């Protein structure tokens, strides 16, 4: 059986649905997880969906994905703009990593315009709400063939 796609989520994403719905939408993280699971299953894949507010835990999960995932869809949230350590962890693993964001980070505050993760990821999908995740799953699967 194919290894699962790991979908990793960074800080404050546990507050989705109530935190700044004008920016992030009204879906909860649980609803995003359910939609991702259905979408991946329709494509013949399972997912492992996780969220942490702690940088080190996300790094550990990326290391784990190197052995236990076929691909990673990663929303590092605010760590996108600050974490060289997450950049290095993404570079250190073999499975393709697709960076995703619900909001269009390039259209927000200037400090959100730079992504350390994009420098290491296979690709990035931003600004499409839930579709960012679903397209991220598609891109991750497509990347497996390359």
UniProtKB/Swiss-Prot annotation:
Instruction: Please give the pathway this protein is involved in.
Output: Metabolic intermediate biosynthesis; chorismate biosynthesis; chorismate from D-erythrose 4-phosphate and phosphoenolpyruvate: step 3/7
Ligase in keyword set: no
Catalytic reactions of this protein: 3-dehydroquinate = 3-dehydroshikimate + H2O
What SUPFAM superfamilies does the database record attribute to this sequence? Type II 3-dehydroquinate dehydratase
Q: Name one GO biological process term.
A: quinate catabolic process
Site Transition state stabilizer: list residues: 19
Q: Which Pfam families match?
A: DHquinase_II
Q: List the disulfide bonds.
A: none
Which GO terms fall under molecular function for this chain's record? 3-dehydroquinate dehydratase activity
Q: Which PROSITE patterns match?
A: DEHYDROQUINASE_II
Please name the InterPro entries in this protein's record.
DHquinase_II, DHquinase_II_CS, DHquinase_II_sf
Name the UniProt record assigns to this protein? 3-dehydroquinate dehydratase
Q: Per the UniProt entry, what species is this protein from, by scientific name?
A: Maricaulis maris (strain MCS10) (Caulobacter maris)
